[in-house]
Amino acid sequence: IKNPIEETDITQGKTLYAVSKLAGEELVKAYQYEYKSFNFSILRYFNTYGPFQVAQFVIPKFIFRVQRNLPPIINGDGSQERSYNFSQDTARATVDALFSSKANNKTLNIGNSSEPINLIDLANLIIKKCGKENKIFPSMNKNFSNTDREDSREINYRYCDTSLAERILDYKVRTKLEKGIEKVIETNIIPE
């Protein structure tokens, strides 16, 4: 997969979850083809995180473990790179798309393409922000044992090109990764 991912790139779902999202997009487009007065906006969210998110996802999962003096567990070698987008920025883009006719019948990437980070650096950043530096270290699960993930389906690099959303919605990332992680830690509520 080439990065950054553009809206026009060929999509390749590797999981049921990914394929179901792509099928939903096609269903919406087919509906609009059938009923011309129907307008849509498809927003592709890239790695949204924020306060109150369950510990199923990487950022709250790492914080949840570190706050309990447990090492964050990294599946794979830790070189996997993502770019994370704070929930308030995602929500703002969603509302903007709802009220902008410029977004009609468009597919837009919503994410943070300016701060890609690998999982080792993300784990160490969270350890530092939780005040556990030099006390807790990431644990590696290189063979993906006891996880819902598979090495063969792992995507090593994934972040998006948001230039179309920037042009159409005046979209911009307002919350940098470090600040967003601090906000999640401050809420101190991560459901299991």
Give residue ranges: language-model regions.
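Conserved SDR Rossmann-fold cofactor-binding beta-strand/turn motif
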Residues: 44-49
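Active-site helix-initiating loop/hinge in glycosyltransferases
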Residues: 50, 54, 83-86
